[in-house]
A protein has these predicted regions:
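Intrinsic-disorder/low-complexity accessory segments
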Residues: 1-194
């Protein structure tokens, strides 16, 4: 590994102008004309569990993927791929929808994570190609081939919930079906709460 590392540094140094140009071209293309069938991905304002959206936004933030509110609402998008029904249908953009555009620095990653249909069938890469994030998080979402004018960045405030037991309480009801439900269950099991 040592010699391979040195050879890589030397090759990069010897081709530094070309390397810099390739990086610049990569980001210019990502922000102006990215590859891929879909131009935007929409996480709908309605029909989604808030905790699931929050978990998605945490993942997007951790990976540097930008997401925005729409510039205007009421636009009807035809031929939008609906993840949950696996069909193309019309969708009207709503005020609190979240748009993940393909045109951004992390274009390739965003498109990979939101691509509705897997193209690789190799079992060696199944774990990284099998699931698009709307499927992973169980979100109502659309993949759009059209350009959508984006508005302000959507930095969603993530709320931490706290639960405190009062004396005499002996139970609590937890909504099941979210990642947070699993985290809660894991924590109480660690604390040996029965």
């Amino acid at each position: 590994h040592y010699w391979t590392g040195l050879a890589t540094v030397e090759a990069t140094y010897n081709n530094s102008e070309k390397v810099i140009k390739e990086f610049q071209d990569f980001y210019k293309k990502a922000n102006s004309d990215p590859d891929g069938e879909y131009k935007n991905f929409i996480i709908t304002a309605s029909g989604n569990h808030e905790h699931r959206k929050q978990e998605l936004f945490k993942m997007l933030d951790a990976n540097g993927i930008e997401y925005f509110y729409p510039f205007s609402t009421g636009k009807i998008v035809n031929d939008a791929f609906h993840y949950q029904s696996n069909t193309n249908q019309s969708y009207t953009i709503e005020q609190d929808d979240i748009i993940i555009p393909s045109k951004q620095n992390c274009s390739v990653l965003a498109q990979t994570l939101f691509e509705p249909k897997t193209f690789l069938s190799d079992t060696m890469t199944y774990d990284i190609t099998a699931w698009s994030l709307p499927y992973v998080f169980g979100l109502n979402a659309f993949a759009i081939k059209d350009e959508i004018k984006i508005g302000n960045p959507a930095k969603v405030v993530q709320q931490e919930s706290t639960i405190s037991f009062k004396e005499g309480q002996y139970g609590i009801i937890v909504e099941w079906g979210t990642v947070n439900s699993l985290k809660f269950l894991a924590q109480i099991m660690k604390q040996k709460v029965i």
